[in-house]
Regions:
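Conserved "HGTGT" condensation-loop signature of ketosynthase/thiolase-family condensing enzymes
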Residues: 1-86, 101-106, 113-256
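Conserved phosphate-binding catalytic cores of ATP/NTP-utilizing and phosphoryl-transfer enzymes
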Residues: 94-102
Length: 257
């Protein structure tokens, strides 16, 4: 018997994406997500009225209780579109994509829009100017929360205050260095060589916050403007939170695409 052709209703595809960046105006995360979502939807206008679910990644910037609902309203989505926000976790963007693919494969979802944003630059600027925070709509019922709600650390970490990522990841890095027989300065060189190609991509990317190519030496060498943040990481090796950026993507079935 010949193999059965795959059901296009159950084959998940990523069909569109959008990004947003703001360096000047003061914005909130929903403002940025609107821009990113509109950019993604512009690539597939026929799917705008077919979105079944709108998922928003948890936001660190202070926002109202229902950013997904606020975003849905600003995008013109009807009440039939499911709105949700995730728990806290760096894994949640990929988890949302994986769950969307699984739901499409199971035949329970056709089109979903996934979005996330931070506006920490704007939040800090407002505070510095003595302005009130822009939390968006604050009079909405809270969005449903999805995802793993377990804390990201256990009693052992709490007991020794090993909580912030900038303390946790350097610990891993030092273990890797020790296993490889490398001192901290040699490990910095390895990390610099790993990260330098990413800066080359960023230098040509219109939505990169830092659009400068750096050499491995630039990244790995401690200097007054590239201080050691937590051994062995220099400042240029650490995550930067003070940006205003957003991204969105649309996952749908092959049939919908």
């Amino acid at each position: 018997m010949p193999p059965t052709a795959p059901d296009s209703e159950r084959i998940p595809v990523v069909i569109a994406s959008g990004q947003a960046l703001e360096r000047d105006a003061l914005v909130n995360p929903v403002d940025l997500m609107v821009r990113a979502c509109e950019s993604a939807l512009a690539d597939v206008p026929g799917l705008r009225d077919r979105v079944d679910r709108l998922s928003v990644v948890d936001i660190m910037t202070k926002v109202g209780p229902a950013p997904a609902t606020e975003l849905a309203t600003r995008l013109g989505f009807g009440d039939d579109v499911t709105r949700e926000i995730t728990t806290v976790g760096g894994n949640t963007p990929q988890w949302l994509v994986s769950r969307a693919a699984s739901d499409i494969a199971a035949g329970t979802l056709s089109v979903t829009l996934i979005a996330g944003a931070e506006a920490i630059r704007s939040s800090r600027a407002r505070r510095a100017q003595g302005m009130d925070r822009d939390e968006g709509a604050v009079d909405l019922a809270p969005d449903p929360v999805v995802g793993d709600d377990r804390p990201g650390f256990g009693p052992a970490e709490v007991a020794i205050a090993l909580l912030a990522p900038i303390h946790v990841y350097p610990l891993f890095e030092n273990v890797l260095a020790a296993r490889a027989g490398r001192p901290a300065d040699a490990q910095r060189t390895v990390i610099g060589e790993l990260l330098a190609p990413f800066t080359r991509v960023a230098a040509a990317h219109p939505y990169a916050w830092f659009g400068h190519e750096r050499t491995a030496v630039d990244i790995a060498t401690p200097t007054p403007d590239n201080r050691i943040v937590c051994e062995p990481y220099t400042k240029r090796m650490a995550a930067f939170l003070g940006s205003d950026q957003a991204a969105a993507l649309i996952v749908c079935s092959l049939a919908a695409a």
